[in-house]
C-alpha cells in the first residue's frame, strides 16, 4: 500500500491555483502557453524534481516525471479554460505527483506522472496528449490556430529551451487519471467516488454561414439574407430532428459564435460558430453528423445563404481497461465509501493515452455539478478520499502487472 501525505497534497494543490488566480473565488485563468500557464508548468517541474523523479518534456510541451522503470503513469493537465476552475486537470496532476512521490519514499512500485499540454483546446481537442499518442500528427497540430490566429507551431516555441526530447509511451504499463466529475451525479448522491466505465466520443467542427450584409432600417424582412436568423432556425430545426436519434446522455452544443459585422444597425452577413456533439456510440455520432449537415444545407437553401463546414475534429468513444476498473473498484471498497460505475461525458487525455496502454479514470464530486467556471470546487474530504483511492488502486494494479 502506498502511504500518501494528504496535507502535502492539499498544500501543493492550493499553491498551484495561485498561478493565474482570477481574483474570483478559487478560479484560474491559465490557458495553454500564456505566461501564467508556463509559470505553473515550471513550478510543477520543480515539484517533480523535488519528488526524486526524472523531469522530461517533449516538443509539444507535455511534461513528465519519470520513475526508474517507468511503471504506472498518473496525471492529467494544468492548463485551464479562459475562465476556469482550480481543480479541472490540476487535481489529476497533483494527486498523481503525490502518489508517485509517496511510492518512492516508501519503496513502493514505480509510479510516474504526466502534465499534458493544451488539454482545454486553445488549439484543438486534447492537443498535447493527441500528439503524444500519435492520434494527431505533429505537423498537422502545428497548423492549428487559436482565436487570435496564432499557430501552435509558432506558440510552442516558447518552451523550446525546456524540451528534453521524445518520451516513449512503451515504458509505462498503464495510465490512471483522477478528475473531478464536472457534473451533478456524485454531488447529488451519497457516492463519493465514480469509477469510469467509458469516455464518450466527441465531434467538433467550425461552420460558416454567409448571407448578405445590408442596412437594418431599410431592408425589408422578406429580402434579407440574415445569417443570425439562419443560425437561429438551424438550432431550432436541429433540436427537432435529433429528437428520435439521441439518447438521454447525448449532448450537443452551438458555441464560439462570431457574428459579422456585429453592429446594431447592420443585417449580419456572416456568422462562424462551433458545432460540437458527444455520445458513447460511434454510429450515433455519425447519424448526428448526417443530420447536422443536411439541416445546414436545408437552412441555406431556404434562406439564400452559403454554408461552409471546416475540418472535423474529434475522438472515438473509449472503454476503460477492465484491470484498472477492478483496481479502482477494489480501492473504493477498501476506503469504505459509496461509489458507482459511471461514464464520462467530458473528454479527457485518457482517451488518447488508451491508444498506447490500458487506461482508467476515477472521479470525485463537483459541488453543485459546476466546472469550467470560477465557482468550480470539491470538498477537501472528497479530494483526500480520491487521493487514497488512487494510491490504493496504483498498488493493486502494479501488484498484478509487475
Identify the role of each PLM range.
Residues 3-6, 18-19, 151-197, 236-243, ...:
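Active-site-adjacent substrate-binding region
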Residues 15-22, 75-76, 338-389, 397:
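Zn-dependent metallopeptidase/amidohydrolase metal-coordination segment
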Residues 79, 118-282:
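Midchain, well-structured core segments that form catalytic/ion-binding scaffolds
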Residues 22-67:
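A non-catalytic alpha/beta surface segment that caps or lines the substrate-entry region
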Residues 2-34, 117:
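N-terminal capping segment at the start of a domain
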Residues 51, 59, 63-87:
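Catalytic-core environment of secreted peptidases
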Residues 56-58, 110, 166-167, 218, ...:
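Flexible, glycine/charged-enriched surface loops at secondary-structure junctions
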Residues 29-33, 253-262, 274-276, 280, ...:
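A short beta-alpha structural unit
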Amino acid at each position: 500500500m502506498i502511504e500518501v501525505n494528504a496535507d502535502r497534497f492539499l498544500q501543493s494543490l492550493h499553491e498551484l491555483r495561485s498561478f493565474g488566480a482570477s481574483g474570483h473565488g478559487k478560479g484560474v485563468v491559465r490557458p495553454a502557453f500564456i505566461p501564467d500557464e508556463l509559470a505553473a508548468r515550471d513550478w510543477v517541474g520543480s515539484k517533480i524534481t523535488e519528488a526524486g523523479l526524472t523531469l522530461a518534456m517533449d516538443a509539444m510541451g507535455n511534461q513528465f516525471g519519470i520513475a526508474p522503470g517507468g511503471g504506472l503513469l498518473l496525471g492529467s493537465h494544468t492548463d485551464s479554460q479562459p475562465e476556469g476552475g482550480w481543480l479541472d486537470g490540476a487535481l489529476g496532476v497533483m494527486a498523481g505527483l503525490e502518489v508517485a512521490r509517496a511510492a518512492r519514499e516508501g519503496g513502493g512500485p514505480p509510479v510516474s506522472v504526466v502534465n499534458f499540454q493544451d488539454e482545454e483546446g486553445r488549439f484543438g481537442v486534447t492537443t498535447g496528449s493527441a500528439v503524444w499518442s500519435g492520434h494527431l500528427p505533429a505537423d498537422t497540430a502545428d497548423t492549428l490556430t487559436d482565436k487570435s490566429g496564432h499557430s501552435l507551431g509558432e506558440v510552442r516555441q516558447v518552451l523550446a529551451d525546456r524540451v528534453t526530447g521524445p518520451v516513449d509511451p512503451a515504458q509505462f504499463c498503464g495510465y490512471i487519471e483522477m478528475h473531478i466529475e464536472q457534473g451533478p451525479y456524485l454531488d447529488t448522491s451519497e457516492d463519493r467516488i465514480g469509477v469510469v466505465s467509458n469516455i464518450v466520443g466527441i465531434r467538433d467542427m467550425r461552420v460558416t454561414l454567409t448571407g448578405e450584409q445590408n442596412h437594418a432600417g431599410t431592408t425589408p424582412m422578406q429580402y434579407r439574407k440574415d445569417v443570425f436568423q439562419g443560425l437561429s432556425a438551424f438550432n431550432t430545426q436541429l433540436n427537432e430532428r435529433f429528437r428520435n436519434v439521441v439518447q438521454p446522455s447525448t449532448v450537443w452544443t452551438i458555441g464560439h459564435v462570431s457574428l459579422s459585422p456585429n453592429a446594431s444597425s447592420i443585417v449580419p452577413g456572416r456568422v462562424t460558430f462551433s458545432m460540437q456533439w458527444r455520445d458513447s456510440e460511434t454510429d450515433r455520432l455519425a447519424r448526428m453528423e448526417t443530420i447536422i449537415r443536411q439541416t445546414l444545407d436545408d437552412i441555406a437553401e431556404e434562406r439564400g445563404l452559403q454554408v461552409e463546414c471546416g475540418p472535423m475534429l474529434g475522438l472515438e468513444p473509449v472503454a476503460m481497461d477492465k484491470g484498472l476498473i477492478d483496481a479502482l473498484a477494489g480501492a473504493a471498497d477498501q476506503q469504505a465509501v459509496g461509489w458507482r460505475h459511471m461514464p464520462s461525458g467530458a473528454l479527457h487525455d485518457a482517451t488518447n493515452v488508451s491508444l498506447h496502454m490500458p487506461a482508467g479514470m476515477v472521479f470525485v464530486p463537483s459541488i453543485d455539478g459546476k466546472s469550467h467556471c470560477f465557482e468550480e470546487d470539491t470538498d477537501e474530504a472528497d479530494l483526500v478520499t480520491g487521493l487514497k483511492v488512487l494510491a490504493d488502486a496504483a498498488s493493486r494494479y502494479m501488484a498484478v502487472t509487475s
